[in-house]
Design a protein with these regions (language model features):
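N-terminal Sec-pathway targeting helices
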Residues: 2-13
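Compositionally biased alpha-helical segments
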Residues: 9, 19-460
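Initiator methionine at the very start of the polypeptide chain
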Residues: 1-2, 460
Length: 460
């Protein structure tokens, strides 16, 4: 009996010592790292099934070892997921430069200064390297060829990209297969990607949609927060007084930017049940935020910078465009009017770069970057020399919508000029950008977003 009592007493003492050690360890751990805040219990709304699934990327990926994977796709594992999202890269070279006489190729100056005094201003040929950007819905196939990536559009146009220069290809792809589960494929294993209309898919997350409010107006459409998060199961990360907190986007009603100054940037998050939470301390909810993409059907896509964004209000997401909603593009055609009064009509190459209606006009306005497919654009009217103070171009769309864009990006002085392939002539006409007064573009037979509104005749 004494032995049992002694053993029992020893066991109790040992347990008390272990309990004290555990409490002490927990207290020290809390001093070093605050416990994560418990996410509020909010039930996400029910997701619509089949209709929304047609907007997800889908295709077949062949690997270098001969294995094929078919299923729903998401770039980089947690980035681009829909046909309206963009694939980005850098062109290997510029084939259009060969059509311009060497002495007429654009030049740029690089002033040399010593102690603030300019001692020379040498000119050198301008950099004609160009980036590539196309919606996944406009793509037919992507192939890997060593250091090159070859992209084929639905129209049949082929573009060679430099694999190691800012290419989305190297982000890898996540595939939801039927038989192998979820597979993450490194780009080094990928030989080719063929895009296909999706069949009936299993469970898939809902898409983010809503309205982004800015000082210059509202933009409504499908949303990518911080250029990445685009489905309801993605999470918004931040810190509260209680520690780190992650919120699923499908539990959020709105996000409002709160900025006292650059060092005290935060976001006010309102949940679907009305509760409000202030998040700070991460890139996603502060100055490090890279902006909000909005697929606004009026313009194609806009990127609202963090400083321009005032509030995002989410709304139930409908079905986005399916693969078949993106018709094959075609050559860019229209007329160029020079400042000297010449009018040149034919197939166009804009900025010694864009030659297809599915390629985009990229220019900013008050913290919002517009990415407008050329097939939506009816005319571009540039400010005259007497309007230098304004420095805004008037862009009219085939829908009748008009937007004033800053003379920067594709509308800026760095534009390399235009080629006009006139019927019956062996070589195209080249017009430097400084000589361009107006560009009128022909209306394509079909586009996405669909062409609405009246037909614009290009009246001056």
């Amino acid at each position: 009996m004494m032995k049992r009592t002694t053993i029992a007493g020893g066991a109790i003492a040992t347990a008390l010592v272990l309990l004290a050690l555990a409490v002490g360890y927990r207290a020290r751990r809390q001093d070093v790292e605050p416990a994560a805040a418990k996410p509020p219990a909010v039930t996400p709304p029910a997701e619509k099934e089949e209709e929304a699934h047609q907007s997800f990327l889908y295709g077949r990926i062949d690997t270098i070892d001969g294995v094929g994977y078919e299923g729903r796709l998401r770039w980089g594992g947690d980035e681009e997921a829909f046909w309206g999202n963009y694939f980005n890269g850098a062109r290997k070279d510029n084939p259009w430069a060969a059509y311009v006489p060497p002495e007429r190729l654009p030049k740029e100056s690089h002033p040399i200064e010593i102690f603030g005094i300019e001692i020379a201003n040498p000119e050198r040929p301008a950099n004609l390297g160009r980036l590539f950007m196309a919606r996944f819905g406009d793509l037919a196939r992507i192939e890997s060829h060593g250091r090159d990536v070859q992209v084929t559009l639905k129209s049949g146009a082929v573009f060679d990209l430099d694999r190691f220069s800012a290419s989305d290809f190297d982000d890898g792809v996540r595939v939801w297969t039927g038989s192998r589960g979820v597979v993450d494929l490194d780009s080094l294993r990928i030989s080719a990607i063929e895009f296909l209309p999706p069949p009936r898919l299993g469970a898939a997350p809902g898409r983010l949609q809503g309205t982004v409010r800015t000082r210059q107006g509202d933009f409504t459409g499908f949303i990518q927060w911080d250029r990445e998060e685009c489905v309801g199961s993605d999470e918004l990360d931040g810190h509260t007084a209680g520690g780190k907190l992650s919120l699923r986007f499908d539990t959020i009603h709105s996000i409002a930017r709160r900025s006292l100054d650059s060092s005290h940037d935060s976001s006010l998050v309102t949940l679907l049940d009305g509760r409000e939470i202030v998040l700070s301390g991460t890139r996603e909810v502060g100055q490090g935020n890279r902006g909000v993409y909005v697929d606004d059907p009026r313009f194609g896509r806009v990127l609202v910078s963090w400083n321009a964004c005032e509030r995002v209000v989410f709304s139930p997401g409908g079905s986005g465009p399916a693969y078949g909603d993106f018709p094959p593009g075609g050559p860019l055609t229209g007329r160029v009017t020079t400042r000297a009064g010449r009018r040149l009509a034919g197939r166009l190459v804009y900025d010694l770069d864009e030659s297809e209606v599915t390629e985009t006009l990229d220019a900013p306005s008050q913290g919002v970057n517009y990415t407008i497919p050329f097939g939506l654009v009816a005319s571009i009217v540039l400010p005259g020399p007497e309007e230098r103070g304004a420095q805004r171009a008037r862009v009219t769309l085939h829908s009748g919508e008009e937007v004033q864009l800053e003379c920067a990006g594709d509308l800026g002085a760095g534009n390399a000029g235009m080629l006009i392939f006139i019927d019956g002539r062996q070589r195209p006409e080249y017009v430097p950008w400084a000589d361009v007064e107006q560009v009128d573009l022909d209306r394509p037979p079909a586009m996405y977003p669909p062409l609405g509104g009246r037909k614009i005749t290009g009246a001056r």
